């Protein structure tokens, strides 16, 4: 099953367990957020929305908030000794799709538990250094 969602003025084709980067969405890291602008729900019998599918939503887990790569906007007017250089970095939210819901259903899955980092065991080479 897949869905086409709209967020931040862009459209994304998503399936369960997909990880995607979108424009900033409010929500704490590790929380579940519902995206209600679902344009298409696909599967055995696809449902097209006009413009959105009624009662459909996508539950996503917020994995991280970060900043995107730097974008440079450089303008130059030739022979005029006029130039302007500006740059910016977008705020990005990293999401993992938990479930695709239809018929006003509530999300059944909660946030996934975080994996604990395993500490390296000291070896003879590390002790000698």
Swiss-Prot record:
> Spans of biased composition, class Basic and acidic residues?
116-129
Q: In the UniProt record, what gene is named as encoding this protein?
A: rplU
Q: Member of which family? A: Belongs to the bacterial ribosomal protein bL21 family.
Q: Name one GO cellular component term.
A: ribonucleoprotein complex
Q: Which organism is it from?
A: Bradyrhizobium diazoefficiens (strain JCM 10833 / BCRC 13528 / IAM 13628 / NBRC 14792 / USDA 110)
Q: Where is this region: Disordered?
A: 102-129
Q: What's the stated role of this polypeptide?
A: This protein binds to 23S rRNA in the presence of protein L20.
Question: InterPro entries this protein is in?
Answer: bL21-like, bL21-like_sf, Ribosomal_bL21
Show the taxonomic lineage.
Bacteria, Pseudomonadati, Pseudomonadota, Alphaproteobacteria, Hyphomicrobiales
Query: Which PANTHER family does this one have?
Result: 50S RIBOSOMAL PROTEIN L21 (PTHR21349), LARGE RIBOSOMAL SUBUNIT PROTEIN BL21M (PTHR21349:SF0)
UniProt entry keywords in alphabetical sequence: Ribonucleoprotein, Ribosomal protein, RNA-binding, rRNA-binding
Pfam families in the record: Ribosomal_L21p
Protein name, entry field: Large ribosomal subunit protein bL21
State one molecular function term (GO): rRNA binding
Q: Which GO terms describe its biological process?
A: translation
Subunit relationships: Part of the 50S ribosomal subunit. Contacts protein L20.
